[in-house]
Amino acid sequence: NVADPLLYMVALGFGIGAFVPEVGGMKYIAFLGTGMVCQSAMFTSSFEAMYSAFSRMHMQRTWEAIVNAPIALDDVVVAEWVWAASKAVISTAAILLVLMALGYGRTPLALWVLPVGFLVGLTFGAFGLVMNALAPGYDFFTYFFTLVLTPMLLLSGVFFPVEQMPAALQAAAGLLPLKHAIDLARPLMRGQLPTSIPLHVAVLL
């Protein structure tokens, strides 16, 4: 879950970055890297809440063993949710460290990207657990990745500014949680406070 975004960041950041030096007042690799931080949190928490939680629930029967103790099923679900968000923070921290090692995001405000990663993890961990509850098998999760996560990855401003898209797509992007996460993270990486923080947090929650 960490290797893929790092590969994208290095390959596209240095490759396209040679032709597009700056985007939105940032080096392209820093612009892309911030998007990769948020999309990594999205994919990590989604994968954990779907594939890993499904395995623990159905294949390993871990949930069944836990609820035999004096623990409610609600507690197990909340624990899975928080664990998915925690893994999102781990992936966020890993990519953030790489960016800082490359000389980007060396500002105290960049540390606030970690709570943003946790919020992203809570959002997509919840989506993942809903899909988990509906899934008859692993193949079912492909629909969520193909129909929800991939379009969100492409339309939320990970690779290029949302402002470059047609007005209708810009309006649609404004409804996407990943776009609001990126709108929080990018200013922080530049050492600036984001605007419309309550709106972005409200969409994520």
Residue ranges with predicted function:
Residues 1-29:
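Hydrophobic alpha-helical transmembrane segments
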Residues 3, 15-16, 20, 53, ...:
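Hydrophobic alpha-helical interface/terminus motif in multipass membrane transporters
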Residues 7-12, 29-101, 128, 146-148, ...:
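Hydrophobic alpha-helical transmembrane segments of multi-pass membrane transport proteins
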Residues 17-26, 53, 57, 100-109, ...:
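Membrane-interface elements of multi-pass transporters and channels
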Residues 19-22, 103, 153-205:
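Membrane-interfacial helix-loop-helix junctions in multi-pass membrane proteins
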Residues 31-35, 43-47, 78-80, 108-116, ...:
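Short alpha-helical transmembrane interface motifs in multi-pass membrane proteins
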Residues 51-58, 64-68, 132-136, 146, ...:
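Short amphipathic alpha-helical coupling elements at transmembrane boundaries
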Residues 73, 77-146, 150, 192-205:
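Alpha-helical transmembrane segments and their short interhelical loops
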